[in-house]
């Protein structure tokens, strides 16, 4: 394994005794003998603590012709991350996620939950490949976080039901064929029984929340695992 750095370095003082140097370019190469197995590169990294701006491009290439690329751009008002996966230069899937921010509301005395709820105002996400697109928005992140933090439930099942209801109230996610623009299904949250057991005379049940695909044509419901299986949707997986 070899690591190289180049370009301008940004100094960040994390505390009175520690200074971190962030290089503009970093490349890590993994070799086995004379063969290059993989190369990870971080390029065009810019960081400005005073203006709260960050930008960087990350790429991972393997000798099997797989490439993963990520671009992150953060400012006081917006954070955007895009990612893509390619095989032999053919795009397999692309992801774009955006957050609307208000960095002026940052207060060092805030708890982590209050900090997140205060600076985030909305989010958008899209996942696209050559055939399918999943797009989602959550325009009231602050209200959603507060609603999740204030769930009052006496059992695990009641909590999961309430949690799913909050997600469904504040998030809008749909599926459509790439280039079509017409949603054929929505994505909703639903509670499910993860596992259960009995100990003596007491029975225990533990619930979680999962996304499910709800088709507009017949209101049928499928988990992501059920729908995106190799037998029924192999061409998308390929």
Predicted segments — roles?
Residues 1-90:
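Long, acidic/polar, low-complexity amphipathic helices and coiled-coil-like
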Residues 25, 117, 129, 141, ...:
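Intrinsically disordered, low-complexity regions
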Residues 34, 64, 89-91, 179-181, ...:
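Solvent-exposed strand-loop boundary residues in beta-sheet-rich modules
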Residues 54-63, 85-87, 112-122, 205-212:
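Short, surface-exposed secondary-structure junctions/capping segments
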Residues 85, 91-202:
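Long, charge-rich C-terminal accessory regions
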């Amino acid at each position: 394994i070899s690591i190289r750095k180049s370009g301008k370095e940004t100094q960040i003082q994390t505390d009175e005794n520690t200074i971190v140097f962030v290089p503009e370019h970093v490349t890590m190469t993994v070799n086995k003998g004379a063969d290059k197995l993989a190369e990870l590169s971080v390029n065009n990294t810019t960081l400005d603590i005073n203006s709260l701006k960050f930008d960087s491009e990350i790429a991972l290439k393997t000798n099997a012709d797989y490439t993963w690329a990520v671009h992150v751009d953060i400012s006081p008002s917006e954070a955007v991350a895009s990612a893509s996966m390619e095989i032999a230069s053919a795009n397999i899937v692309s992801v774009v996620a955006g957050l609307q921010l208000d960095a002026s509301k940052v207060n060092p005395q805030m708890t982590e939950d209050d900090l997140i709820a205060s600076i985030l105002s909305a989010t958008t996400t899209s996942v696209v490949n050559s055939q399918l697109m999943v797009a989602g928005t959550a325009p009231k992140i602050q209200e959603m976080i507060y609603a999740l933090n204030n769930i009052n439930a006496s059992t695990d099942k009641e909590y999961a039901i309430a949690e799913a209801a909050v997600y469904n109230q504040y998030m809008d996610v749909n599926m459509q064929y790439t280039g079509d623009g017409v949603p054929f299904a929505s994505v909703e949250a639903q509670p499910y029984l993860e596992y259960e057991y009995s100990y003596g005379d007491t029975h225990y049940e533990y619930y979680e929340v999962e996304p499910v695909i709800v088709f507009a044509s017949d209101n049928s419901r499928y988990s992501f695992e059920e729908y995106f299986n190799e037998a029924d949707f192999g061409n998308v997986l390929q």
